[in-house]
Amino acid sequence: MSLAIAGTGWITPLGSGVDAVWHKLLDGHEAAATKISEQFRTRFYSVFRVPESALTTPASHPRLRRASLISRFAAAAGLEALRSAGITPDSQSAERIALVFAISNGGVIYTKRFYRDIVATGAQSASPLLFPETVFNAPASHVAAILGITGATYTLVGDGAVGILAIKMADDLMTNEELDYCLVVGAEEADWLLCDAYRRWRLLRLAPPIEPFAQLGRGMILSEGAGAVLLARVGRRRRADAKDDPVLIERTHPGGYYRKRAEAEEILKRILCDLSQTEIDFVISSANGTFIDLAECRALKQVTPNALVYTAKPALGESVGAAGLWQVVLAAQALRCGELPPLLRAEPTIPLRISASRIPVTTARHAIVLSCGVNQQAAGLRLRKAD
């Protein structure tokens, strides 16, 4: 089934709003890193945080007064996606909107606080206010309540590829004729504990920049934020966005799992082969400065050597749970606007079609979103700009 992207939402370290963030990427902006530390710890890590100004709209909602950052990011992105599609759920339409939430690390900040109190002073100190925020489906619950969505709600847990897998799930859900739309949201919050874990797995670098497709992967920088995509059946797009050429999700690929890093390249090749049955104009990659870059570079060079390649992670960081949705928003914007941003921090010797300056793609019709997570998942999808 081909689904139309009816609306998108973006909360990133470069701010909020799809158009605003898009223009910053086109201008070559790069998020500013913030140093974070932990009590009684001497090690500092760099992260790309979302500016407070990006969360002004939904933060006043009563349900979000004590909610975790990840829930606030998700609500803001979901609200923007609905607004961009001209949709305000009411008692009747809310039942015909499904929600699929993509998550990876979850609400780490509140979970850490909850268990720290227990360890410090005993089980009697466990906060009933914090506990609901420790479960993976807490952000989905907040988003559904705030946006007024009463249809089916699901939470999908995975790694950096989980956003693409969530869209695959939405594609399956939309075969139900009782649904008109499906809102797919992915979100992530950055914390010292996550940075320390990824460093121990030799996936993190202590300070920017992220160097994509480097021969020696020096690691990623974690970031936070959310992305949202509102999917509709072709023909159900509102007049509010009728002036734009619709972007369709032409095919979703379930991807696969790799046990060893050396196997990632073969899975990525298989995904690209299945999705490139038509001419592909550009690929939005998930290269983030880790082993993923080399695997994707080899797969892209072999299967789609003529396609332009771009990754936003040098500018935005690795947002894990939100990363896949960010890639889809990027691909849709590039097809609509006919332009790709400059690839930052890339060496000119990379054996792919890349550009260090913004490049027009006005005739582009097909794009692939390729997503490989660091925890053994890979997936992809193909977008098409409708005639």
What role is predicted for each listed range?
Residues Y154-L156:
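Short beta-strand-to-loop elements that line the ligand-binding cleft
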Residues E178-D180:
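Alpha-to-beta junction loops
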Residues M169:
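Internal active-site segments that recognize and position negatively charged phosphoryl groups
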Residues G160-V162:
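Catalytic nucleophile serine of serine hydrolases
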Residues M1-A152, I164, D172-N176, A187, ...:
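Conserved "HGTGT" condensation-loop signature of ketosynthase/thiolase-family condensing enzymes
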